[in-house]
């Protein structure tokens, strides 16, 4: 079973992703440093949740960007 993240964590992650898209990677530790740098989080648990969801969100968005082109390539190969 996966974790369910609150609306606040999702909102913060989307804001970070939209503003600092170029700095975010698929590495958790790198994203944790980004969260420390740009978000004032007092709780270690919340910081880690934000960094974890940011990593997952990055992978999802990266997959969405590449999937339409892959489908077009598969269709053209079949023809």
Curated annotation (Swiss-Prot):
GO biological process: translation
Cysteines joined through disulfide linkages: none
SUPFAM superfamilies: Rps17e-like (SSF116820)
Gene Ontology CC annotations of this record: cytosol; ribonucleoprotein complex; ribosome
InterPro entries: Ribosomal_eS17, Ribosomal_eS17_CS, Ribosomal_eS17_sf
Alphabetized Pfam families for the sequence: Ribosomal_S17e
PROSITE patterns: RIBOSOMAL_S17E
Family indicated by similarity: Belongs to the eukaryotic ribosomal protein eS17 family.
Name used for this protein in its record: Small ribosomal subunit protein eS17
Species whose genome carries this gene: Saccharolobus islandicus (strain L.S.2.15 / Lassen #1)
Highest classification ranks of the organism: Archaea, Thermoproteota, Thermoprotei, Sulfolobales, Sulfolobaceae
């Amino acid at each position: 079973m996966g974790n369910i993240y609150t609306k606040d964590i999702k909102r913060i992650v989307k804001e970070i992703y939209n503003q600092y898209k170029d700095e975010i990677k698929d590495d958790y530790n790198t994203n944790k440093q980004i969260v420390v740098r740009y978000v004032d989080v007092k709780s270690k648990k919340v910081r880690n949740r934000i960094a974890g969801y940011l990593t997952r969100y990055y992978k999802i968005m990266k997959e969405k960007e590449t999937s339409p082109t892959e489908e077009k390539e598969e269709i053209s190969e079949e023809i």
